[in-house]
């Protein structure tokens, strides 16, 4: 049976109740907030989270080649084209119901993928395509849930909420992958067994997560709650999506996110090879730098960006502008850096400056959409449209 903790009235500020913590980290909201954040990471923990340092043992476990793994990731990418229709679904159904359904589908299909040996590659493609469809629905529900849990009359905390979403997700992924890498080092002769075991275990983590979502995440307003007399909830959800699509500020916020995410994609795939090819860094140095520059720095930057957005700049939009400025300065400096002996360390420092700016911007990627103060029953579609624009670079 579902039990939820109701939110306080978002039109009344809770910041004056004797606590310096933002509203989503206090009282009845802290656990629901963390539950939504974990839903945004644990759904990916048994497949997409392995695509970096664990891609080779993952493909061996599935019995596929690297190029076939690329095909699966391509099918996952169809989410890009489905974010806008996913906005209608986010208007029509609650955050809780969407996240529970998303996790349940990942649970069932993930167990099929990793439990059945010699699974047909065609079946894998069908599973990957279904994941892409659900990602277009589920991810906007995650960011909408974060915005929903952090809503307060004084608006303070939304930037930090988005920053923590990024930091917690990166931290959880890093720790879960470290555990797998450690196990692979201990049982190096049983790679596929270890990978299969952890993939199944990480998939089964979704079971308690689903129960937590059902029990802890409150119901948000949806289109059916605001439909006029004689008007269906489906029509109201569609009207809400159209209303979001014609708002220039939603498009501008999404395009700003696109600039940040474009830089992010180039950073994670190019920084380590850049050091190796241009400054002749060893594979060990380039690899270690890549892990730090795109892993640990990302965890730190999310928290820093959230704090700066809320408590210094008073706006996630301003924070994103500052992040893009830092990124531009770092990029220009790297471009002007002469190639030669002894320049590898200056290049690494400048790449870290770039990474810091990029991750600060990525941490508040969709926070400007949350700051538009749209009605609760259409905010899900706004996050979907923002996701469509921000992730268009991939």
Task: Please report, for each region that a protein language model flagged, where it lies by residue.
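Cytoplasmic helix-loop-helix junction between adjacent transmembrane helices
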Residues: 127-169
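A late C-terminal transmembrane helix in Major Facilitator Superfamily
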Residues: 373-394
């Amino acid at each position: 049976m579902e039990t939820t903790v109701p939110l306080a009235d978002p039109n009344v500020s809770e910041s004056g109740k004797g606590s310096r913590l933002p509203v989503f980290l206090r009282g009845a909201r802290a656990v629901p907030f963390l539950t939504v954040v974990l839903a945004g990471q644990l759904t990916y923990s048994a497949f997409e989270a392995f695509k970096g340092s664990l891609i080779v043992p993952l493909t061996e476990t599935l019995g596929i080649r690297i190029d076939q793994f690329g095909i699966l990731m391509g099918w996952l990418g169809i989410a890009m084209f489905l974010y806008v229709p996913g906005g209608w679904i986010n208007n029509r159904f609650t955050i809780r119901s969407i996240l529970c359904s998303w996790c349940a589908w990942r649970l069932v299909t993930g167990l099929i993928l990793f439990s059945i040996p010699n699974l047909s590659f065609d079946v894998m493609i069908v599973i990957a395509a279904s994941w892409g469809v659900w990602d277009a629905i589920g991810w906007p529900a995650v960011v909408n849930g974060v915005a929903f849990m952090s809503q307060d009359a004084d608006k303070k905390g939304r930037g930090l909420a988005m920053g923590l979403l990024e930091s917690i997700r990166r931290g959880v992924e890093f720790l879960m992958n470290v555990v797998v890498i450690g196990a692979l080092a201990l049982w190096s002769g049983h790679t596929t067994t270890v990978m299969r075991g952890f993939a199944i275990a990480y998939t089964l983590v979704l079971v308690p997560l689903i129960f937590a979502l059902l029990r802890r995440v409150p119901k948000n307003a949806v289109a059916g709650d605001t439909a006029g007399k004689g008007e269906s909830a489906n029509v109201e959800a569609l009207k809400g999506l159209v209303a979001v699509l014609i708002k220039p500020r939603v498009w501008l916020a999404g395009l700003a996110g696109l600039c940040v995410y474009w830089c992010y994609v180039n950073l994670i795939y190019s920084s380590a090879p850049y050091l190796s090819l241009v400054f002749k860094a060893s594979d060990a140095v380039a690899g270690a730098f890549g892990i730090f520059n795109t892993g640990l720095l990302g965890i730190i930057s999310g928290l820093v960006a959230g704090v700066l957005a809320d408590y210094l700049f008073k706006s996630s939009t301003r924070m994103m502008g500052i992040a893009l400025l830092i990124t531009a300065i770092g990029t220009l400096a790297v471009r002007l850096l002469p190639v030669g002996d002894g320049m590898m360390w200056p290049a690494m420092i400048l790449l870290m400056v770039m990474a810091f700016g990029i991750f600060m911007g990525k941490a508040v990627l969709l926070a400007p959409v949350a700051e538009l103060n749209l009605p609760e029953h259409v905010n899900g579609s706004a996050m979907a449209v923002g996701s469509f624009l921000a992730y268009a670079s991939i």
